[in-house]
Structures are given as structure tokens and as C-alpha cells.
Amino acid sequence: KFLASAINEHYNIDKFFLIGTSKSMWEEVYSNFSNKKNSYDENTYNDLKEEIILSGENAETIDLSCVEEALGKGSKIYQIKYGINEAELIYNLEIFMKLSEILEDGDEIYIDITHSFRSLSLYMFVVLNYIQNVIDKKIEIKAVLYGMLESKDETKPVVNLEIIYKMIEWIKGANEFKNYGNSYTIADLVEKEGNTEYARKLRNFSDSLNLGYMGSLKEQINSLKNLDKIVLKHGLGTYVIPKIVNDFLEYFKNAKTESETQLNLSKWFYDNKKYSNSYFTLQEAMITYGCENQKYENNFDNREKTKKSMKAIYSEYKKNFSRNKYRKLSDSEVFSKIFCEITIIRNNIAHSGKNRRSYSEDIEQFLKDYNAVSKMMRKRIELRF
């Protein structure tokens, strides 16, 4: 009669949390579970049935302590409203949120939506997402079950809808990757599907990105290129990973050098509103370009040498500003001027300095600087240090 009873026998459930209205068939729940414990009492059953019949649809609650006792130690019943208006929906949501106070780290949850309102399963998914992603309780959803009682077969099939919840996890991971470059959630999901090697590559990519390791980032980006073809031959990831990985790689499709990779990454940071990272990466791209242009090996000493050269050119430009403002600047002067102005903004960001301009002006300035630098780098201008 109740799928919950079959779930109990199959999975050996510790405790039940039942959710329903004052008009739900609580007397049948009592009958089913108390009979299994040989504690059924006819008078209790009749009294409960009468109370349910006499209670109006707007009744706040009825006494269901006998049902909780029949369900077993630790079990709890939550009585909700019909949800016919916003006030009742909010009331129901608050009831659901109380579950977050009871669930504990390590709990394994089996959800039965067979006898519920259609809206209850939606509530449950919202609450479980809240528990896992906001208050961060380590719980595991083992199954989301629906008993197809309308089937004409003598044996009624039970469908596990856990795949819906898993898809929500994939969507969450996709959002983290798309907006922040964080692949950790997706890496965990990929690993669960048995792809340990590519889970490691995903984590390495995000580690390099978040640490700002420009030297290894080009290699990490290249490691993503065949991810959608190799990693996921089946499974939910096939619906998510190709889209987000290809959207990210689109930024780098024309990048042939390390400096171009860094330049394009600065634009990706900007488009995803990580403005500090965008300035940092644009500056690093300009230094890398300077090393490439001078045919320097890209190491610390040569990068410092390149920075000093650009600062010296800008310093000379400023020293003779009254004369220079009437002539066309060389490519080296324009490039060095932008680099030094970016350095000032970056230092203000990094050291919480007193900015001479508003934040919005610095954000707008990035696009101007990016477009100018991009144009010069694409033309492969020659820098004269």
C-alpha cells in the first residue's frame, strides 16, 4: 500500500520524515506500520480517522504522535498546507527548511515522492540543494523513488529518479566552470564515472588558473581540447562538458603563442567580471610578448629585464612630455606607456591603494587597453628596447 514500507524493508531505513497535509491518509500510515510492529490498536485507528475527517482543510495541525511512534524512533511528521497561494507556499517552504536542522553529516537519504503533491518533489530538490551548497552538510542522496501504482501489472515498478538530481549537480558544476573557471565539481563527477586521469587534468587546470601560474596555463588549456571527445563516451556529462569546454576554448582558438594565450585569458577574466585577474593577466601577457619579441628565454630574469626596459621607455617619455605630446609615439612607446599605466591600476588593486579614479573607470579602461594591446600584438609590432 505504501512504497515507504517497501523502501524500509529493502534499504533498512533508520528513520522516516513524512510530509503531508492534515487531510493526508495518516490513519493508513498508522495501520501499515503499526501492524508490522504488532502494535496496531483499532481505537487509535478510528480516533485518528475521525479527527482527519472532522478537521477542515485549513486546519493547522492534528495530533499525529501515534503515527510517529508507529514509524519508529527518530521519525518525524511535518504537516504542510495545500500551497494554493504565496503565503501557503512560503509556509510550506519554511517547514521544508526545518529538515536542514535535523539532517546531519553522513546521512544517506532515500526520497519517496509516490503519494505526494507534484510540488513537494520540487520543494525537496530546492531544500537539498540548499543543504549541500549553502550550509554545506555532507549528505548523500541515494535514491529518488516513484512507485508506479497505476500500473495494471500485479508487480508495481519503482523508478529511481536520482538522475534528475545528478543532472542538477552537473549543471551546478557547469556554472562554476563557465563563470569562474572552477572545474572541481565537474572533476568530482567525472571521477565518479571512472575517469580519474581527466579529473586530475581538470583540477590541474583550475589550480593553475586560480594560482595565476601563467607558465603552465597554456599547457593546461591544451589538455582540455580533447576532453569532450575522450572523457565522456556516455553519461550525463556528455550533455554538459562539450558545451562549457568548447565555449571556454573558443577564446583561445586563434592563439599561437604564449602571449596570445595570456592576452585571450585576460579577456575571459574580464567577461566573467574577474577584473583584478584581467589586469594581472594582461600585464603578464605584455611582458611575455616583450620576451618573445626580443627572442629572450621566458624566465624570471628576462621578464624583469623586459619590465625595466618598458618602464625606462615610459620614464623617458614622461620626462620629455612637453615635446613628446606633439609627435607620434613609436610602437615601443605606446606599448610601454600602456604597460606602465596598467601597472599603476594593478598595484592599486593589489595593495588597496587610493585610486585616482573610480572603479567603474578602471573597468572601462581595461577594454580600451586590451583592444590597443591586442591590435599591436596581432600585428606583431617590433619593440625596440
PLM features per residue range, with description:
Residues 224-336:
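Polyanion-binding interface signature
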Residues 326-361:
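Histidine-centered, metal-coordinating catalytic motifs and their short helical/loop contexts
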Residues 118-135:
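Short Gly/Thr/Asp-enriched flexible loops that form oxyanion-binding sites at enzyme active sites
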Residues 158-257:
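Long, charge-rich alpha-helical interaction segments
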